[in-house]
A protein has these predicted regions:
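Non-catalytic helical/linker scaffolds that mediate oligomerization, partner binding
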Residues: 1-275
Length: 275
């Protein structure tokens, strides 16, 4: 991972522009997960390969451990391979596959991924629809947020403290949405780390950041025009919240972000607005 980062730097790629997802598929990867996670932007748990490289009965615990570590570090986690394997040939998933997908959601995965089902399967569209339905239903479980809410995180800087405060404030006042106004996507990812019980809007002016945010847990990416002041920033944030259809007149929202001309990644503002 470090070699890839050095190569990207040599090629002139700005730091953070290209994110690296490390695929864990061997005992060596599992044994060195902390170091790999520190160097990466996220982890893919490749259960199919893991089940070949290590005893298959260990895979579920390894999956849960890796996802938990990702949540604590605020890194993305992707659970992948053989999730709806039977749908390569069949139009419906098995009951075991349905439970597998749901449990990956309960574990707190940032994303769940299909591979052979859509790459070479006979029912690719049905597989995507089935996985989406299972994930949406799993998230409706009233205990879902309790399963995945990290308790042992460590606040390292002002941006993390502000993002945590935004989540706590939103819960205390009964806000319907958190709007993270972000240029690079960093602020939205920090808010996502704390797994708030409400949706997060990641509002950005950067198309690359917009695409990346689709992989962050609970984040709805929204493109915005450039903003020249804090007032304009928060006005656009309210407009973005209304455009999603998730709020109505009288609802409260929490907005967080940084000064328009400030350094990327240095969120230092928080506000409560009423629609």
């Amino acid at each position: 991972v470090i070699d890839i980062r050095n190569w990207l730097k040599e090629c002139g790629s700005p730091e953070g522009e290209v994110e690296i997802i490390a695929k864990i598929e061997s005992r060596a990867g599992v044994n060195n997960i902390d170091e790999i996670l520190e160097a990466s932007d996220g982890i893919m748990v490749a259960r199919g390969d893991l089940g070949v490289e290590i005893p298959f009965e260990e895979v579920p615990n390894i999956q849960k451990t890796i996802i938990h570590k990702c949540r604590i570090q605020g890194k993305r986690s992707i659970t992948a391979t053989e999730m709806l394997e039977s749908m390569i040939k069949n139009p419906r998933p098995t009951r075991a596959e349905i439970s597998d997908v749901a449990n990956a959601v309960y574990d707190g995965s940032s994303a769940i991924m299909l591979s052979g089902e859509t790459a070479a399967g006979e029912h690719p569209v049905e597989a995507v629809k089935a996985m989406a339905k299972i994930a949406e239903q799993a998230e409706k479980n009233t205990q879902y947020i309790n399963y995945i809410k990290p308790e042992d995180y460590h606040i390292k800087n002002l941006s993390e403290a502000l993002s945590h405060s935004a989540c706590t404030l939103a819960q205390d006042i009964g806000a319907k949405l958190i709007v993270a106004c972000t240029r690079s996507g960093y602020t939205a990812k920090l808010v996502s780390r704390f797994r708030p019980m409400i949706d997060i809007i990641g509002m950005t002016t950067d198309e690359r950041a917009y695409r990346k945010l689709a992989l962050s847990w609970g984040v709805i990416p929204v493109m915005s025009e450039e903003f020249s002041s804090v007032d304009v920033l928060f006005h656009f944030g309210k407009c973005a919240a209304i455009a999603t259809g998730l709020v109505k007149k009288g609802d409260k929202i929490v907005l967080t972000g940084g000064k328009p001309n400030g350094k990327s990644g240095n969120a230092n503002l928080i506000s409560v607005e009423t629609i």
